[in-house]
Amino acid sequence: MKKKAIFGGTFDPIHNGHLHIAYKALNRLKLDKIIFIPSGNPPHKHKECITDKNIRYNMVKYAIEQEDKFEISDYEVKKKGKSYTYETIEHFRKYHPNIDLYFIAGADCLMDIHKWKNIDSMMEKAKLVVFSRPGFSMDTILFQKKQVEEKFKKDIIFLDIPLLDVSSTEIREKIKKGEDIKDLIPEKTYNIIKKYGLYR
């Protein structure tokens, strides 16, 4: 049975840390494919605070185009209204009923996942994979993981991987200050940022 994972995010911008996580997940879980899904209108973020969804889509598209096992979906970008994770997973489950489906997210999601819309449905349709995030101790992550597993009666896969010290927020702040960010993002992402004068 094919194994595919959804890797959703705002990707504002996509950076080397995202790609590092994707490669580690690909190898650790022996995945056939990772599907990057740039969020359209995430319910937890104000629309005016994020870059145009089509620009973010292109940043991801060109960042991953050389990797055969990475692909991009425009499902959320084209979707009208808010982008809820459970709807995205239902969409992929509908068109790929006979695959092992995984959903990759930062371990910080464990803190408020009980507030996610239709989380029960999501947990039934995809296996949750979490990776560590800066600012969260291993003890905290494992405690929250156990709490969520007990609540939803589902196992959660934890990827204990060394993280690159980079975040989209940090990159945006560096650009505002005029600092160099070339080593933190894919070259084609950098070119798009320069083209549109983003984050200044």
From Swiss-Prot:
What are the EC numbers?
Answer: 2.7.7.18
Gene3D superfamilies reported in the protein's UniProt record: HUPs (3.40.50.620)
User: Which reaction is catalysed here?
Assistant: nicotinate beta-D-ribonucleotide + ATP + H(+) = deamido-NAD(+) + diphosphate
Keywords from UniProt, A to Z, are: ATP-binding, NAD, Nucleotide-binding, Nucleotidyltransferase, Pyridine nucleotide biosynthesis, Transferase
| InterPro entries attached to this UniProt entry | Cyt_trans-like, NadD/NMNAT, Rossmann-like_a/b/a_fold
Please state the pathway this protein functions in, per its UniProt record: Cofactor biosynthesis; NAD(+) biosynthesis; deamido-NAD(+) from nicotinate D-ribonucleotide: step 1/1
User: What Pfam families does this protein's entry cite?
Assistant: CTP_transf_like
GO BP terms: namely:
NAD biosynthetic process
**Which family is it part of?**
Belongs to the NadD family.
Q: Give a short account of what the protein does.
A: Catalyzes the reversible adenylation of nicotinate mononucleotide (NaMN) to nicotinic acid adenine dinucleotide (NaAD).
Please identify the protein, giving its name as recorded.
Probable nicotinate-nucleotide adenylyltransferase
